Design a protein with these regions (language model features):
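Conserved lysine of the Walker
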Residues: 20
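Small-molecule kinase domains that catalyze NTP-dependent phosphoryl transfer to phosphate-bearing small molecules
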Residues: 16, 140-190
């Protein structure tokens, strides 16, 4: 039987601090060098980049500190990112999916021919994002929900979007309820 060489896309969801990025990093480590080339993609990176542009324009940006990619700063000022994201989705509900789709297409188009490209989307939050990528990518999509005991939604926006996805459980393939130490073991089994 021939080996599956169709591009692979992991869409990882879960509440803030559930271990999505840790799981993606473990998958990247697992796939790279094993006949695959993996790269992490995030819907929210473009949002954080534009928020950082505002900080730069105001003369207060400081990499790693006053920076929306820095965890502590992001958590403290999450409200701005939530409102900006909500506003942009009001303009076009697929705005972030459309942007990420273009990034993944570029990754797939330029992947070496002798490797299987693996896109790891570590911040999937909305059902329409899955539906958009499933429609526009010729890839095998694997969805994963990360659950971490003791952690719940960071805000109402996160709670609502996760509830919408859970109502459409037929699209979820895998639900992982593991502590961060167990993530590496699970990733190595994929």
């Amino acid at each position: 039987m021939p080996k599956n060489t169709k591009p692979l896309v992991f869409m990882i969801t879960g509440v803030a601090r559930a271990g999505k990025d840790t799981f993606a990093a473990c998958l990247m480590e697992h796939f790279n060098g094993n006949g695959c080339r993996a790269e992490v993609f995030k819907f929210a990176d473009v949002l954080k980049d534009r928020a950082n542009d505002v900080l730069r324009a105001m003369g207060v940006f400081k990499a790693g500190e006053r920076d929306f990619h820095a965890e502590e700063f992001k958590v403290r000022h999450r409200g701005l990112l939530v409102e900006l994201g909500r506003t942009l989705r009001g303009v076009d509900k697929d705005i972030f999916a459309r942007h990420l789709n273009a990034q993944i297409h570029m990754f797939l188009d330029y992947a070496p021919l002798d490797v299987r490209p693996v896109a790891l989307v570590s911040d999937w939050r909305y059902l329409n994002e899955y539906l958009f990528l499933a429609k526009h990518l010729d890839a095998q999509i694997v969805t994963v929900e990360m659950q971490r005991p003791g952690y719940g939604p960071a805000n109402d926006e996160e709670a609502g979007s996760l509830a919408d996805m859970m109502a459409s459980m037929q699209i979820l393939h895998t639900r992982l309820a593991v502590d961060p130490a167990g993530v590496r073991a699970v990733a190595s089994e994929i």
